[in-house]
Amino acid sequence: MALTQFENDLEILRDMYPELEMKSVKVEEEGEFPQRINGKLLFKISLLADVNIEFGEQHMLLSNLSNECVEFTIYSCHYPDIRRCVVMDIKSLWISTDEKKMLIDKALRLVEETVDMSIEFADSFTSILILIFGFLIDDTAILLFPNGIRKCLTQDQYDLFKQISEEATLQKVSRSNYHCCICMEMEKGVRMIKLPCENANVEHYLCRGCAKSYFTAMIQENRISSVRCPQCEYKELKLEDFKSYKKMLKALFTPLIPVSFLKEVIDTELCERYEKMFYNQAATRLSKYCPYACVTCRRCDSWCTKEDLDDAMIQCQKCHFVFCFDCLHAWHGYNNKCGKKVSLSTDIIEEYLDDTVTSYERKRKLEAKYGRRVLELEVNDYLAEKMLDLAIKKEGSNLQRCPKCKVVVERSEGCNKMKCEVCGTLFCFICGVLLYPEDPYEHFREAYSGCYGRLFEGMPGTET
């Protein structure tokens, strides 16, 4: 075979595969077929349909793959022994060593089964390469993705496929035309910015100029809720719909436009301003809905948010000050009790307590808002107070509440003029009314008083 015919064959191959490179061609004499041909081809495995990439509970759809590379050396002197004639190596970031060996073996077996080994090598040279390249491009997906699924063995493998998918998407976007939803101009994807819309099934784009001016204006005007895709429908977050406090936190403190995205579009100073305003706005809203969730740090005045509603210990993420949510002093440990910062209303406690009226879902929402442990403690206190009230109202009871601090006082002896040992308040044991400190007995002397003449009523030793 003349060398010019070999060169013609190479031109045919290059026309079919523009990425084909021939590294070296060695000949002994002019006009002879090359004894050794070195080359490589960048190729992309063709996916007939989207494939599922899985790792544990993570999964994603993959539509395109990155370029792989096959390096080959052909020795004409070893023909027709195709195993010695063709030496191949596949370069890939994600195809395993065993899979590479399997693909090469199947490619060579296809050549052995298809090419007529009785003809001259010069006549079969082009056919061999076309078969190998065609197999790698068109027939390997079914082997590497059986049933359209690829199960990753490590997180790194899964992340690699995620990166491949993102790069393939970027390449596709850069070649396509898109409308900016603000100025309505059409531009190539390379000049556009794809917005990170909450709905993954939609694709909205802004040209770089509009993206910068829009987000800059929204932040400068303190319109934090407008820092989002201007084309997507906006739905305000309803905190009362959440049944989990942690899910509420995640939803409330996750911006619709990630700060990492904004850093690629606007100035760093504006990004920092937005991040601070967004967090403060979210924390303020949470503190109004969940009284046990947020408080400002007494050291640096930054908002601090609880990770666990039932935990009184809280740490400032800015200055790292650890303090008690209830008393706002430096953390004193769980065993040293302090006063409650917030008390629940009786209506909330009774609603949580009543299983006949309150549904399971409503209870979960109350727990997401106030904390399960907080509710249980409040319920226990409420029931204890109810029991005390019943004991006080019982006929012949020697118990009464202080009208000021509500502490239960027991009369073991003496008259009906009582003094609270906690707050020092003077009151009538019979009716609970406050007594004048200057003349506490006036209440029992006045004829219009319901306790007139009853100062010693019920006093041990005075029964008649």
From Swiss-Prot:
Domain of life of the native organism: Eukaryota
UniProt remark on domains: Members of the RBR family are atypical E3 ligases. They interact with the E2 conjugating enzyme UBE2L3 and function like HECT-type E3 enzymes: they bind E2s via the first RING domain, but require an obligate trans-thiolation step during the ubiquitin transfer, requiring a conserved cysteine residue in the second RING domain.
Binding sites annotated in the UniProt record for Zn(2+) 4: 428, 431, 443, 451
Mapped zinc finger ranges (IBR-type): 267-338
Catalytic residues (UniProt): 415
Region (TRIAD supradomain): 176-455
Pathway annotation: Protein modification; protein ubiquitination
Family, per entry: Belongs to the RBR family. RNF14 subfamily.
Zinc fingers (RING-type) by residue: 180-236, 402-431
EC number from the UniProt entry: 2.3.2.31
CC per GO annotation: cytoplasm; ubiquitin ligase complex
Assembly behavior: Interacts with translation release factors eRF1 (SUP45) and eRF3 (SUP35) in vitro.
Name this polypeptide is given: E3 ubiquitin-protein ligase ITT1
Residues involved in Zn(2+) 2 binding: 290, 300, 316, 319
Miscellaneous comment: Present with 846 molecules/cell in log phase SD medium.
Described purpose of this protein according to its UniProt entry: E3 ubiquitin-protein ligase involved in translation quality control. Involved in the rescue of stalled ribosomes by promoting ubiquitination and degradation of proteins on stalled ribosomes. Specifically required to resolve RNA-protein cross-links caused by reactive aldehydes, which trigger translation stress by stalling ribosomes: acts by catalying 'Lys-6'-linked ubiquitination of RNA-protein cross-links, leading to their degradation. Interacts with the translation termination factors eRF1 (SUP45) and eRF3 (SUP35); overexpression decreases the efficiency of translation termination.
Catalysis: reaction(s): [E2 ubiquitin-conjugating enzyme]-S-ubiquitinyl-L-cysteine + [acceptor protein]-L-lysine = [E2 ubiquitin-conjugating enzyme]-L-cysteine + [acceptor protein]-N(6)-ubiquitinyl-L-lysine
UniProt source species: Saccharomyces cerevisiae (strain ATCC 204508 / S288c) (Baker's yeast)
Family matches, as PANTHER family: RBR FAMILY RING FINGER AND IBR DOMAIN-CONTAINING (PTHR11685)
BP-aspect Gene Ontology terms: protein K6-linked ubiquitination; protein-RNA covalent cross-linking repair; regulation of translational termination; rescue of stalled ribosome; ubiquitin-dependent protein catabolic process
